[in-house]
UniProtKB/Swiss-Prot annotation:
The gene is pdxT. It comes from the Bacteria. GO terms for molecular function: glutaminase activity; pyridoxal 5'-phosphate synthase (glutamine hydrolysing) activity. The active site is at C82 (nucleophile), H172 (charge relay system), E174 (charge relay system). Belongs to the glutaminase PdxT/SNO family. This is Pyridoxal 5'-phosphate synthase subunit PdxT.
Length: 192
């Protein structure tokens, strides 16, 4: 099994480290040719945290947005953390257009405020158990469609969800030593 990690900006190296701990090979995807070269060998894709506007702009400039969107729309498993969640959202409040727009969720960017408002907590995540959660100016999911399964909430705000083969978190599991969510994603990839 091999997992692609979008490596345009953000915490891609941290996700690679988590996969390595699980014995899973990963490949960094930096441009369209790179994506096309590896796509048929991949079992899934991770969209890391970072700055969603910058990543979205790079996806468009590198002509990666539509091919990746088509792959996700056809059922290709994807795990979006923080900015990756925003990229997958069908609607982003206070923003005219979405990026991939494949997941039936409405997202509020930077809902947890400035960098100084970042925090750490632990909470239950359906199908995974109690896990550590690191929030860095994280988004929140303000509403979900009927087919979206809410996996975790913190202070009555949705912070993790799944729709079919799409898994998202508004926090950064790659910044902890807990492998549970990455294992959960690998299980999604195995049955896809």
């Amino acid at each position: 099994m091999k997992i692609g990690i979008l490596a345009l900006q953000g915490a891609f190296a941290e996700h690679a480290r988590m996969l390595e701990k699980l014995g899973i090979e990963s490949v960094e995807l930096r441009n369209l040719k790179n994506f096309q070269q590896h796509y048929s060998d991949l079992s899934g894709l991770i969209l890391p945290g970072g700055e969603s506007t910058a990543i979205g702009k790079l996806l468009r400039e590198l002509y990666m947005l539509e091919p990746i969107k088509q792959a996700i729309s056809s059922g290709f498993p994807v795990f979006g953390t923080c900015a990756g969640l925003i990229l997958l959202a069908k609607e982003i409040t206070s923003q005219k257009e979405s990026h991939f727009g494949t997941m039936d969720i409405v997202v509020e960017r930077n809902a947890y405020g400035r960098q100084l408002g970042s925090f750490y907590t632990e909470a239950d995540c359906k199908g995974v158990g109690k896990i550590p959660m690191t929030f860095i100016r994280g988004p929140i999911i303000s509403s979900v469609g009927k087919k979206v399964n809410i996996l975790a909430t913190v202070n009555n705000k949705i912070v993790a969800a799944q729709e079919k083969n799409m898994l998202v978190t508004s926090f950064h599991p790659e910044l902890t030593n807990n492998l549970s969510l990455h294992k959960y994603f690998i299980d999604i990839c195995k049955v896809a």
